[in-house]
Amino acid sequence: MKPMRPIFLAALLIGIFAAFSAAQDAGAPLEIATERTLPNAILSASYEAKLTAKGGVPPRSWAVIAGALPAGLNLDPVSGTISGAPTALGLFRFAVEVTDSDDPADTRTREFTLAVISALVVEWKNPPAVTQDGIAGSVKLANQTADDVDLTMIVVAVNEIGKAFALGYQRFTFAAQSTIPEIPFGSALPRGNYIVHVDVISEVPERNAIDRARLQTSAPLETH
């Protein structure tokens, strides 16, 4: 009898191990393995998260049985993959059931939470205020995406007749998953009543992705 070739023997052992592992998995109780809090999704951006289970009798099927996924996302009943591009911000809670192929079938249910967040966040650090000769303030920024972005920020004060005056301009590379605690702005202005507008635009040229965030004062500021 000829000795087994090493490659054939290795393939045989791998096959035996895989079959043994599958048998062990099938003999174990059905269980959802994915953590209850899913990775955040970015508004309007492509998203994918895979739900996983172990035990029970494969193949398994998945279904949302309570609550709802964020608009724009869907659950694949075969693979357990949640994918799509969400169209609404918020924190979403929903329950998912997995069913195996045993006879009778076994099921398990788990509630998940999924947050849909803005790619770019701009907030007042120091709200605009009248100074001795104009208006000044500051904002804080957050890039919540996984991309470094080209960021442009423009701050203007618009008076009662619609004339705009520049209060600030910034352009720089904004690192992924980072924040800038304060960016100041301000300038001397003629006497008048002004609404302050902040417009922030981020771009990822390689993906042709653009996001925008805005702020404005709720009431006019009167300079003297």
What do the PLM-derived regions correspond to, one by one?
Residues 92, 192-198:
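A short tyrosine-centered beta-strand micro-motif
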Residues 51, 90-102:
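A short beta-strand micro-motif common to beta-rich folds, especially ectodomain repeats
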Residues 47-55, 96, 138-139, 184:
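Core beta-strand segments of extracellular beta-sandwich domains
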Residues 71-87, 137:
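Strand-loop-strand motifs at the edges of beta-sheets in extracellular beta-sandwich domains
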Residues 28, 115-123, 219-224:
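Extracellular interdomain linker/stem segments of modular secreted and single-pass surface proteins
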Residues 43, 54-58, 67, 145-147:
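Short glycine/proline-centered coil/turn motifs in the loop regions
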Residues 99-105, 203-206:
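Short, solvent-exposed loop/turn segments at the edges of extracellular beta-sandwich modules
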Residues 104-116, 170:
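C-terminal edge beta-strand
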